[in-house]
């Protein structure tokens, strides 16, 4: 979910508490999915207890189906399970009010959150030089002054690093990827293609040969958004879980260790405790995450996963080092990166120019991959490295917001 279309920000508040398990409600503007919920276990719940809980759930649902009258609509029940890093266990599915009441009273349950729609967020060594760059953001990242047209970078260019792009998919056959992009997993439909274009644009900025910051990085498409650039929060979390397992060596991915992996999430929706907790589990596993701050011109604390402190939250800057008028801001923003009128790849072999914090975040993801390729330590601490390297450049960044603009340390 990039920030092309407007993501709806909402704050989750406790609706009720039954035996300690909170049922959260979405704010007044949330695009909730009827009868769909995410159920999060208490942190101390073990794998064995989680399995026992889901068995209890299935038995409870079966009893309800047997008692149900023919005129009542049957709910689908549990549809997905999540386990991230041993600290986040949850499941999602379709449940009626009575079942949600039963689930909330179970001792293993920490909280229950309504599922909702999430949308894209678009609106000094021997250096290699790329002259007359096709997108101004490339030149800006490698120069201490605005207005340049050359991108300076080390030839290592992120080789040996894998970037997971959690988005609308990637046109892996686009010639600018030179065979470095592949499909990972699709959680939204049966079409392994980017029918929206957002994910391909994002991936191009991360690691395109001509348009990307890390020109040697391997790219993996994790599709969680459909052709309209939208999907469910539960589906996004499922994509996050898969990417974390692959990046940690639990699957058959190209990243053999979490420290050699980066993730980009140019998407967001209302503030979600479940989404933030899943993002924290990924960070705790030693994986660097760049996340779009959002495009509502408000405090990023109202958007997820941008409001999770352990990720690297990115606001959007303009070509003259101003804050993009749409960009979110606030204390949770870690850095600014180019995000207005960014040219990158489009499915089918062409290019497109888009604006949004969705375009800013992949600059940071690409920079993260580039720095790991240079030997910098990966993981969430890489965001601190990026902030230390950044320079004060953004004019009027927003109340309580950093003025730091990313820089790759080229010395130029």
From Swiss-Prot:
GO cellular component, one term: extracellular region
Domain Peptidase S8: 135-412
Function: Secreted subtilisin-like serine protease with keratinolytic activity that contributes to pathogenicity.
Transmembrane segments: none
Keywords for the protein's UniProt record, in alphabetical order: Glycoprotein, Hydrolase, Protease, Secreted, Serine protease, Signal, Virulence, Zymogen
Species for this entry: Trichophyton tonsurans (Scalp ringworm fungus)
Gene3D superfamilies named in the record: Peptidase S8 propeptide/proteinase inhibitor I9, Peptidase S8/S53 domain
InterPro entries noted in UniProt: PCSK9_ProteinaseK-like, Peptidase_S8/S53_dom, Peptidase_S8/S53_dom_sf, Peptidase_S8_Asp-AS, Peptidase_S8_His-AS, Peptidase_S8_Ser-AS, Peptidase_S8_subtilisin-like, Peptidase_S8_subtilisin-rel
Glycosylation-annotated residues: 123, 126, 252, 264, 408
GO process terms (BP): proteolysis
Gene that this sequence comes from: SUB6
Residues in the signal sequence: 1-20
Family membership: Belongs to the peptidase S8 family.
Protein name as annotated: Subtilisin-like protease 6
MF GO annotations: serine-type endopeptidase activity
PANTHER family hit by this protein: CEREVISIN-RELATED (PTHR43806:SF11), PEPTIDASE S8 (PTHR43806)
EC number: 3.4.21.-
Domain Inhibitor I9 per the UniProt entry, residue ranges: 36-120
Propeptide, chain numbering: 21-127
Residues annotated as catalytic: 167, 198, 358
Subcellular location as annotated: Secreted
Pfam families cross-referenced by the UniProt entry: Inhibitor_I9, Peptidase_S8
